[in-house]
From Swiss-Prot:
Assigned keywords, A-Z: Cell cycle, Cell division, Chromosome, Coiled coil, Meiosis, Nucleus
Residue segments, region Disordered: 1-42, 171-218
Native organism: Homo sapiens (Human)
The organism's taxonomic lineage, starting at the top: Eukaryota, Metazoa, Chordata, Craniata, Vertebrata
UniProt KW Cell cycle keyword: yes
GO CC annotation, single: nucleoplasm
Classification via InterPro entries: Syce2
Subunit: Homodimer. Found in a complex with SYCP1 and SYCE1. Interacts with SYCP1, SYCE1 and SYCE3. Interacts with TEX12.
Protein role: Major component of the transverse central element of synaptonemal complexes (SCS), formed between homologous chromosomes during meiotic prophase. Requires SYCP1 in order to be incorporated into the central element. May have a role in the synaptonemal complex assembly, stabilization and recombination.
Name of this chain's protein: Synaptonemal complex central element protein 2
Bias-annotated ranges (Basic and acidic residues): 1-32
TM segment ranges: none
PANTHER family linked to this entry: SYNAPTONEMAL COMPLEX CENTRAL ELEMENT PROTEIN 2 (PTHR28398:SF1)
């Protein structure tokens, strides 16, 4: 395989600096011999070929050293890039983990707060429902008592309506039952007025009793 010409990049080589081709100390004798044998024909051509081979060897050796240096620098750059990527990846991983931890903690605190609010509201609702149940029970009890009072008032009213008829029958005898109306005294109170006054008194007593029960509840 023949080596093709390669453009040499302008790189400063610290390890090895190529010597100028004109200052080589290995081939001055070859050059002198070539100058002496310049008129010799084939001998001079072989001498020039030898000089060219020596110069090309020096050139390619310096080129190989430059390529090696470039490869080393490229490898160092790649390693530095990989290290930077690893550091960035570790940093992002730590940031993600810390963010997850903070978000989970915040979520737990928020959830606990919401549950606490729910519990407080449930307690308030239970207390209100219990108070409402107690009030409804008291209302039912008062309703029952009111019905009993109304029944008692109705019974008293019926008794008061029947008492004048019985007293008239006892006072006037059987003639009253035959249709004869006895004379009424002037100062006697009509039965209806008497019954109405009794009913008003009873209703006032019932109202005062209900008000007393309400005051006791409050």
């Amino acid at each position: 395989m023949e080596r093709q010409g390669v453009d040499v990049p302008h790189v400063k080589c610290k390890d090895q600096e190529p010597q100028p081709l004109g200052e080589s100390k290995e081939h001055p004798r070859w050059e002198e011999n070539c100058e002496e044998e310049a008129g010799g024909g084939p001998a001079s051509a072989s001498c020039q070929l030898t000089v060219l081979e020596g110069k090309s060897g020096l050139y390619f050796s310096s080129l190989d050293s430059s390529i090696d240096i470039l490869q080393k620098r490229a490898q160092e750059l790649i390693e530095n890039i990989n290290k930077s990527r690893q550091k960035d990846h570790a940093l992002m991983t730590n940031f993600r983990n810390s963010l997850k931890t903070k978000v989970s903690d915040l979520t737990e605190k928020l959830e606990e707060r919401i549950y606490q609010i729910y519990n407080d509201h449930n307690k308030i609702i239970q207390e209100k429902l219990q108070e409402f149940t107690q009030k409804m029970a008291k209302i039912s009890h008062l309703e029952t008592e009111l019905k009993q009072v109304c029944h008692s008032v109705e019974t008293v009213y019926k008794d008061l309506c029947l008492q004048p008829e019985q007293s008239l029958r006892l006072r006037w005898g059987p003639d009253h039952s035959r249709g004869k109306s006895p004379p009424r005294p002037g100062n006697s109170q009509p039965p209806d007025v008497f019954v109405s006054s009794v009913a008003e008194t009873t209703s006032q007593a019932t109202a005062s009793e209900v008000q007393t029960n309400r005051d006791g509840e409050c």
